[in-house]
C-alpha cells in the first residue's frame, strides 16, 4: 500500500467548488465508510475545512481515490493536487503547522487536523500507518511552533474580517453586529469584536444554548436561528460561519433588510464553506459581501511579514520528513524478517509440542526425533520451495537470484565441527 494525499484548497479551487467538495456533519462518517469499502483502500482520513478538503489514504493507486472524489463532487479533478509517500508526509506536516494556510501560521488548522484524525479513528478508518503519521504530525507541528515564531501573534481570517469592518465602519462602537453560528471562527470574531467595544452584539445559532454561552462571555444577546430574518435589518455588520449545507441568508432577505434600513449600508462577511450567504447579495447596492476568497488578498501582507519564521519552520519540516521516511523504510525492511522469524517460531513451537506429546505417550525417542526433524524440514522449506518452483516456471530471475544469495551452492562445503572446549587444570602448563 502507498500513502496518498489528494485535495484542493484556497490556492487551487474557487469557493463554489470548495463548498461542493466539503464534508460536514454526518456526511464525514458516511464518507469514511464509503472510502474503506473500496478494495484498493486500507486506511483513510478526511480533512474538511472552509479552505480545504483533503483525503489521506493508504491505497494501491490514486485513480480509485480520484474517481471517488469525482463521485462526491463532479468536476473537481482538474483542481486536485496529489502527493504520495514522502511528499504526502511533507504536505501534512506543512498543513498542520499552518504553512499551507490562507493566514500563514494560523493556529486553528492544527485542531482541525486533530479532529480529522479523531473522527477517522472513532469510525475505524485508521490503521497503524496513518495513525503513526498523524501522531508524528502533531509532534512536528508542536515543535515548529515552539522553535520558531511562525505561530506568534497569529492573524486569523476572523480577525482580518473584523479589521476590515473597523476600516469600513470607523466607529464600531456605534454599530450593531450580528454573528451567525457559534463555532471556533465565530468565537474568534466575537472576541475581537468585544475588544472593539461594538455597541450591540447579536449572536444567532441553531442551538440556542451555544449562542447564550457565547453571548454571556462577550456581552451579547443570543437569538434562535429562526429569528434571524426578523433581526437582520438591525445589523450594520454580519459575520456568518456555520456548517449549513444551504445558504442561511438569501438575497431576498437582505433586500428586505435594506429597505427596512432605508438603504443604510450593510457589510456582510461569509466565512463559511459551503457559503452561508447567497453570492448574488453582492449585486445589491448598499450591500457589501466578502467571502473567504476575498479575505485571502487582505491577509497577503501578513504572509509576507511572516516569511522568515516560515522558512525556519520549513527547515524543521524537511529534517523531520527525512527522519520519518528513514524510520518508515527501516520498519518496512524489518517486516519480512519479523514475518520469517514468527513463521519459524510458530512452526517450531507447534511441532515441538507434538513431539513432546509423543514422548509422553511412550513413543521411542529416536523415532520422535526423526519425525520432528523431517516435519521441521518440510514445513520450513515448503513455502520457499513452492515460490522458487513458480519463479522458475515464470522466468522470475530476480527471485531465483535472491535464492542463490540466500542458499549459496559451494561444492564440498561442510559446516565446521563444533569445537570441544579446552578444560584447564591446575597441572596444565601455561600457554607459551
Curated annotation (Swiss-Prot):
Q: Where is this region: Disordered?
A: 407-432
Q: Which residues form the active site?
A: 50
EC number(s) per entry = 1.2.1.70
**GO MF term (any one):** glutamyl-tRNA reductase activity
What keywords are annotated for this sequence in UniProt?
Answer: NADP, Oxidoreductase, Porphyrin biosynthesis
Give the positions of the site Important for activity: 91
Q: Which GO terms describe its biological process?
A: protoporphyrinogen IX biosynthetic process from glutamate
What does the record give as its pathway?
A: Porphyrin-containing compound metabolism; protoporphyrin-IX biosynthesis; 5-aminolevulinate from L-glutamyl-tRNA(Glu): step 1/2
Q: Which PROSITE patterns match?
A: GLUTR (PS00747)
What would be one Pfam family of this protein? Answer: Shikimate_DH
Q: Which residues bind NADP(+)?
A: 181-186
Q: Which residues bind substrate per the record?
A: 49-52, 101, 106-108, 112
- Function of the protein: Catalyzes the NADPH-dependent reduction of glutamyl-tRNA(Glu) to glutamate 1-semialdehyde (GSA).
Q: How does it assemble?
A: Homodimer.
Q: What is known of its domains?
A: Possesses an unusual extended V-shaped dimeric structure with each monomer consisting of three distinct domains arranged along a curved 'spinal' alpha-helix. The N-terminal catalytic domain specifically recognizes the glutamate moiety of the substrate. The second domain is the NADPH-binding domain, and the third C-terminal domain is responsible for dimerization.
Name this polypeptide is given: Glutamyl-tRNA reductase
Source organism: Xanthomonas oryzae pv. oryzae (strain MAFF 311018)
